[in-house]
Amino acid sequence: MATRLLRGSLRLWGGLCAPRLPTASRCSHSGGEERLESPSAKKLTDIGIRRIFSSEHDIFRESVRKFFQEEVIPHHAEWEKAGEVSRELWEKAGKQGLLGINIAERHGGIGGDLYSAAIVWEEQAYSNCTGPGFSLHSDIVMPYIANYGSEEQIKHFIPQMTAGKCIGAIAMTEPGAGSDLQGVRTNAKKDGSDWILNGSKVFITNGWLSDVVIVVAVTNREARSPAHGISLFLVENGMKGFVKGRKLHKIGLKAQDTAELFFEDVRLPASALLGEENKGFYYLMQELPQERLLIAELAVSASEFMFEETRNYVKQRKAFGKTVAHIQTVQHKLAELKTHICVTRAFVDSCLQLHETKRLESAAASMAKYWASELQNSVAYDCVQLHGGWGYMWEYPIARAYVDARVQPIYGGTNEIMKELIAREIVHDK
């Protein structure tokens, strides 16, 4: 069993002994090591490639890959039927040190760098197992608490979330408000020092298993604009009036619990307010670039997985007396796919480097999300086609990857909204 890396100790996993995770101050790139980039690598999913990583990252990646191979892949089909992963998996991930990686140690996180967090994103994509909501929990929900929470909130939630004993979700989307966050109708009204929360949310990842949910709510309808009247609240499972409606049945991400949530006169103490009153929209705008970068990373990594899966298939599948890989049209398609994926990988890695040093702008994150998620769907379509009829069979990994890809251009802000944000930056007079 793994012992989680803490303050100078060693990480143990399956006999593998690794130093503590790299931090931005210690090691955030290859440091002069000779490393192949994706176009020159034997496989796009190889360990030890790409200059943004170091040998320390490689050791960590080996342990993460082993975790997904041993603890996730064997059970994922079962979780797809259940519509959720087991809580036991969350605690195993916590013990392995896969949660809260990029959250500071002083807050109760692991204290690793962004690249270490990205390794978990990538390895989950390479496993083709979309059920565990680790990335949303660790790299979307936890940063809100770490960045805007009070000392009391941080101490209460972050250590338990890092251990996998408290599962986090964030509730933005409503039946009538998706990409338009200013259209939120869920509201919280003051009642003495408390707040009374009413409304509903939908399409909430980790919603069914969640122990704490960050809820976006209107707190000032008289504000000069909707953006100036939104606040964030920490709502805990079991609070009176907080009801989880049902797990939603999706065409993809079948093992990922996605729920609708209802709030009927939920009484929240003043301590449930996250950050300052009416500053919620500002906090959302600050954190959305990381969410969009995460989606881009998952998208290009899934594309790398699909390419390798398809390359292996066409080299084995025979037609017209030879393997499909020897048909020129197939070779040309593989050449196109690898080129598009490698170009996108270079851009997304560049965005990771910018974000590690807090220099990733919203427009660039929007470009990465838009481009990589479109690529993922294009790659999925072509890879299914190269599999022929077998690509349409659920037992083939490419079929799962195909349906899982479709939501990527939708959540985190639709790609149409991404283009609006990119265009706004282009035409804006600075």
UniProtKB/Swiss-Prot annotation:
State a single Gene Ontology molecular function.
flavin adenine dinucleotide binding
Q: Sites of the modification N6-succinyllysine?
A: K66, K81, K165, K240, K254, K279, K322
Q: What is its main location?
A: mitochondrion
State whether keyword Phosphoprotein applies: yes
Could you say which EC number(s) this protein's record lists? Answer: 1.3.8.8
**Catalytic activity, reaction form:** a long-chain 2,3-saturated fatty acyl-CoA + oxidized [electron-transfer flavoprotein] + H(+) = a long-chain (2E)-enoyl-CoA + reduced [electron-transfer flavoprotein]; hexanoyl-CoA + oxidized [electron-transfer flavoprotein] + H(+) = (2E)-hexenoyl-CoA + reduced [electron-transfer flavoprotein]; octanoyl-CoA + oxidized [electron-transfer flavoprotein] + H(+) = (2E)-octenoyl-CoA + reduced [electron-transfer flavoprotein]; decanoyl-CoA + oxidized [electron-transfer flavoprotein] + H(+) = (2E)-decenoyl-CoA + reduced [electron-transfer flavoprotein]
Q: Where is the transit peptide?
A: 1-30
Q: In which pathway does it act?
A: Lipid metabolism; mitochondrial fatty acid beta-oxidation
- N6-acetyllysine PTM positions: K42, K66, K81, K92, K95, K254, K279, K318, K322, K358
Q: Where is the active site?
A: E291 (proton acceptor)
- Residue numbers carrying Phosphoserine: S54, S55, S362
Q: Which SUPFAM superfamilies match?
A: Acyl-CoA dehydrogenase C-terminal domain-like (SSF47203), Acyl-CoA dehydrogenase NM domain-like (SSF56645)
User: Which residues bind FAD per the record?
Assistant: 170-179, 203-205, 317, 328, 385-389, 414-416
Cofactor(s) needed, names only, are: FAD
Enzyme class of the recorded protein, top EC level: oxidoreductase
Stored InterPro entries: Acyl-CoA_dehydrogenase, Acyl-CoA_DH_CS, Acyl-CoA_Oxase/DH_mid-dom, Acyl-CoA_Oxase/DH_mid-dom_sf, AcylCo_DH-like_C, AcylCo_DH/oxidase_C, AcylCoA_DH/ox_N, AcylCoA_DH/ox_N_sf
The entry's substrate-binding residues are: S179, A227, H228, Y282, P289, Q290, E291, R292, G412, G413
Where is it located? Mitochondrion matrix
Family membership: Belongs to the acyl-CoA dehydrogenase family.
Q: What name does this protein carry?
A: Long-chain specific acyl-CoA dehydrogenase, mitochondrial
Record the organism. Answer: Sus scrofa
